[in-house]
Structures are given as C-alpha cells and as structure tokens.
Amino acid sequence: MAKAFSGKKPQHFGNTIRVFLNYLGRHKFMLGLVGVLTAVSALANLLGTYMIKPVVNGILETGSIPGLVRGVALTAAIYAVGALSTLGYTQTMVRAAQKVLHDIRRDLFAHLQTLPLSFFDSRRNGELMSLFTNDVDTISDALNNSFALLIQSFIQVVGTLVLLFVLNWRLSLLVVVGYAVMFWYIRFSTNRSRFFYARQQQALGDLEGYVEEMAAGQKVVKVFNHEQTNLEGFQALIARLQSAGTSAQGYSATMIPAVVSISYINYAVIAVLGGLMVMNGQSSLGSLASYLVFVRQSALPINQFTQQGNFLLAALAGAERIFNVLDEQPETDEGTVEIVRVEKSADGTLVPSAGGRRTGLWAWRDSADPAAPLVPLRGDVRFRDVSFGYIPGQTTLHDVTLYAKPGQKIAFVGSTGAGKTTITNLINRFYDITSGTITYDGIDVRKIRKSDLRRSLGVVLQDTHLFTGTVADNIRFGKLDATDEEIIAAAKIANAHSFIERLPQGYNTMVSGDGANLSQGQRQLLAIARAAVADPPVLILDEATSSIDTRTEALIEKGMDRLMEGRTVFVIAHRLSTVRNSNAIIVLEHGGIVERGSHDELLAQKGEYYQLYNGMFELA
C-alpha cells in the first residue's frame, strides 16, 4: 500500500516558516517595495483618519470655510496617496508571488528527479500531483491575498493604538483590554485551526491520489464491476475531507464574529465614556470624533489579520508537505568512473565520439585520474553473493551469484516474486544491494556514476510507458540527441518502421494518453526501438514480449537477434519460447538461484525448469 504523506499535527511550523522566508528572500527588492508601499498605504489611512480632529476643531473654533476646504483637500490628498500605494503594492505582490511560486514548483520538480525509486514506490502519483496543485494553490492564495494585507493590518493596528493613546490615553486603556481579549481568542482558534488545516491538506492529497488511481484503472474497475466499491471508497475520503474542512473552517469562522462583537462592545462603552468626558471638558469634540472613528476602524485590520491568518495557516500546512518532500534525501552517487561513447581516432586510440554520435563502441575511465586512459567496455556483468531486500529485515534476494560474459544472452525464469525483476533493478542501481558485489567489466557498480551506468544499459520495462509527443519523440527518449536517421534505424531494428510508416503522420504522429491510440504490440515495439536507439552494450528486456501477439513476437525476435549482436542481454519473459536460444537460463525461486544451464541441459536435469517447461508450474 502506498505510503501517505504525514497527516498528523504539524510539528515543524517554525522550520516551515524559515524555509518559506528563504524563498521570499530570493526576491528581496520586490518584497521590500511591497513592504514600503504597504506601510505608506496603512499610514495614509491612519493619517487621513487623524485629520478629522483638526478639521472638526477648526470649524468649531473659527468657522472658516477656506480652512475647511484646505483641511478636506489635504485629507483627500492623503487618501489618494494611500490608494495609489495600495494599487502599487497589489500589482508588485502579484509579480513577486508568481516568482516565488515558480521557484517552489521548479525546486520541487527538480528535487523529485533526484529522489530514489524507493520514494516513488511508497507514494501514489496523485499524492505527488497534489503537491503541485492543491498545496501550491494554497501558497498562491496566501501570497496574493494575505502577505501584504497582514503587513498592512499589523501597521494599522499598532499605528491605531499609538494614535489612540495620543488622543486620549485614559480611554485607550479600555481599548487595550478589548485588544487583549480579541488576540487571546484569535490565538486559541488559530491553534485549533492549524491542526485541522493540515488534516485538510492531507485529505486533499489522498483524494487526488485515489481519483488518479481509479481513473487510470477504469477498465479493470468495469471488468470486475467494482464501481459501487470505488464509490464507497470515494465517499469515505470525501467524508474525511469534509470533516477536516468543517473543523478547520468552523474554528476560523468564529474568529471574525468574535472580533466584531468585542469591537462593538468596546465602541459602545468608549462612546458613552468619551461623551461624558466632552461634557465635563476633559476632551474636545474633534478629538472624540477622531477617536471614535479610529476605534470603529480598528476592527477592520484586526478582522483582516484574522481572516488572512486563516489563509496563511492553510498555506503553511501545504508548504510543510512540500518542504517535507524537499527534505527527502536525494539518491546518492559517489561514483567516479565514467562511461562514454567512443570512436577510434586515426591512430587507433579510443576518443569520445563527436557529439555522442552512435558508433557501437563504449569505454570507461576513472575521472578521479585525469591521466587515466579510456578502456573498452565489453559488457561483462557479475553478481557475487548478492543479498537485497526492499524492506529492511525482509530479504528478496539471498546469496545470488551469477555472471554474464560479453555478448551472452542470459534468461531469468521463475514464478511471481522469485526475484527476476529485482535482479535487473539492481543492475541499474535503482536500489543498492544489502551485501555482496555487482561488477560491470570488473568495476564495482557503486564506483560508476549512476547516470553513465544507466546510459549504457538499454532497458525495455515490463510496463511500456509512452509520453505525450510524436512517435519520433518517444523513440528519441532513449537518446535525446539522436538524429532522424538514427531514429529510423532503431525503428527498423525493432521492426517498428513498417507500422510507423502506415500511421497518419508517420514518425510525426502524435502519441497521447500513454499511447492509447496504439495497440499493445505497437507500444512494445516503440519501447524496443527506444532501447535500440540508445545503442547500449548491455540490454535488459523485462518481460518485453509478454503482451504481444505471436506474429508481432516473431517480428520482434528477428529484430532482437540483430540488436543483440555483440551485446550482453538479460531477458525476463512469460513464454519459455523466448528464452530457448539463451546462452544460459537461470531459474529463480524464493529469491535464490535453483538452476542454471542451457535449455537442453535444464530439460535433461528434469528439475524446476523441466516442470515449468511442461506446464507443471506456472511461469510468471
């Protein structure tokens, strides 16, 4: 079962905030400009409100109409500056937010490319997709809507409090009490909401993973009539999402009404006491008018602070999930031996081929020694006492010793779970062995750069995966710098050229939906052509012909005979007919080798292979 991302109460919000601030810090100038413009906007609003005092007092004391006009004009100018500043920080924040989101998406995708296969084995595709959609979207909402408003609200709250004390320090003590009650309740609700926002993001990820999985497997679902079962599973997931969302939004929804209610009570009490102070001559009417407007307006930034804080909590929950993935350790590669395509120079020495041109020749050298010569790569692969387990403490392979000499075809047969595919995964170093040694031309594979090792191994995976693009693009995936001539040559080797020529646009025919517009056999032929264009010294066919009809299989076998010339080949197949001409057949059972020999030798032994061949055991 796929491992889910952590849905427990967040434990590292402090670290999440620090990493988030680091991303913001990459765009200091733009965010600094946002901060300045936000501060100007907030201060303009405060100053505009403060202007009520001199305007009202001026009218009462002098009755001067020109003075009134000047005061109103000055107030209007202050508010205009605030409006322009608001427009400026809004537009700047949009651009800054998109830059930050670009950085997060880029870093996340780039980091995923560096993670070991075991990371993807334990997680569903939909959960990973949710990181780029749901979680990034919550960050986007927070940056676009909340960042500047939080700054503005903070400045307005602090500025309002300062001006209130300037206008009337006695009444301001009551305001402080009201603020204290507000912030206590906000903190209480925030702490509760934070837990449920994290649960909500986790539920969204699980839901997207489930939908993606069911959409990909609809044919199987319908074959076995599991529509109702799937619906019940979906309803359980959306019930979890509903529960988490209701709790998160429920606590959040109480904050604004609570703040408004407290501010109204505060306002009423202060209005009564302020009126008494004016009647007793302890305050001017202008001061009270300005003071009451400040008190009334103070609820707005607090409400904004509360509301945007909710968006920020959701964003931090999403950011924590993203940053947890970014904290995953990348695939380690300490290899110094490089493998390169080579060609022979005029004097017969090996030199790297120009532009990686296909030459059929490969060589290796230790990059740690600049003077090291290029040594021809022959394709000799050996396992010595190799043990391995996908899960610590559980052994999948034990004490496996085998060899494949250059140019040999080695076939693996055995029942499901015997360890056939695991062996090919270890050759590729998709996983590292627990004990023992795997050598490639006498070099421990752990000393070879993984990228070079995999480049020298042509692989046809058990499940053919095609990408959106043309037929030529999918073949070129095996060698990104392959020329059109190399693409066609590879297709001919795989016997795919004839069917490609019959497609509507030939090699430019678009492939979409993982090759849904192609037959199983055609997809398999393209996968083999993809391996052929790589021109590798070692070829791995993981059940490459298991889903192909007899006629297509015959075409592939003819092409593969040409492709295998001079190469070391490992084959895993369902059909024993595909391994008859192997130099050696290795029979695996329960993670160990039980027999090795040629087809005739193994039949003569009348052991496991004999029983498989005669249909007494199921081959998988």
Segments (PLM) and residue ranges:
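An intracellular "coupling" helix at the cytosolic face of ABC transporter transmembrane type-1 domains
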Residues: 26, 117-118, 136-143, 147, ...
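Helix-loop-helix
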Residues: 61-66, 70, 163-177, 247-320, ...
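Juxtamembrane loop-to-helix connectors within ABC transporter transmembrane domains
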Residues: 16, 24, 56, 89, ...
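Transmembrane helix-loop-helix hairpins at lipid-water interfaces of multipass membrane proteins
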Residues: 31-88, 92, 165-170, 268, ...
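Hydrophobic alpha-helical transmembrane segments of ABC transporter permease domains
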Residues: 36, 44, 48, 73, ...
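Short intracellular "coupling" helices and adjacent cytoplasmic loop segments at the cytosolic face
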Residues: 2-8, 98, 106-136, 209-233, ...
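Membrane-integrated ABC transporters
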Residues: 1-44, 60-74, 89-93, 97, ...
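ABC-type nucleotide-binding domain
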Residues: 342-620
